[in-house]
Amino acid sequence: MSGLRVYSTSVTGSREIKSQQSEVTRILDGKRIQYQLVDISQDNALRDEMRALAGNPKATPPQIVNGDQYCGDYELFVEAVEQNTLQEFLKLA
C-alpha cells in the first residue's frame, strides 16, 4: 500500500482511542493532508498489519504509516504538531 494511512477502529469502548483518532483526522483534514483511514475492526488481518508495521504486538489505534514506513502513534503525532515538524513526521518532506 502506498500513501499516508491512519489505522483506526470504528468499534471501541475506549473514549481515549475515539478522541485520539478524532484529533488525528481533524488535524490532517485541517492541514489538507490526504490520507486513507484503515478500519482495523473490519478485519483481523488489518489489525495484525498495523501491529507489524508499528513493531508492537499490542499497538492500538491510531497508528500512522506512510507507504510501508511507520511514522508513529498518537503521542508522537501530537509531539510533531507541537514542534511544527509534522511534514517530517509523516515522511512527506
From Swiss-Prot:
Tissues and organs where the protein is expressed, per its UniProt entry: Ubiquitous. Expressed in heart, kidney and liver (at protein level). Expressed in brain, lung, spleen and skeletal muscle.
PROSITE patterns in the cross-refs: GLUTAREDOXIN_2 (PS51354)
The Glutaredoxin domain, residue ranges: 2-93
Record keywords, A-Z: Acetylation, Cell membrane, Cell projection, Cytoplasm, Glycoprotein, Membrane, Nucleus
Transmembrane residue ranges: none
Keyword Lipid metabolism: no
Similarity section: Belongs to the SH3BGR family.
The protein's role, per its UniProt record: Could act as a modulator of glutaredoxin biological activity. May play a role in cytoskeleton organization.
UniProt protein name: SH3 domain-binding glutamic acid-rich-like protein 3
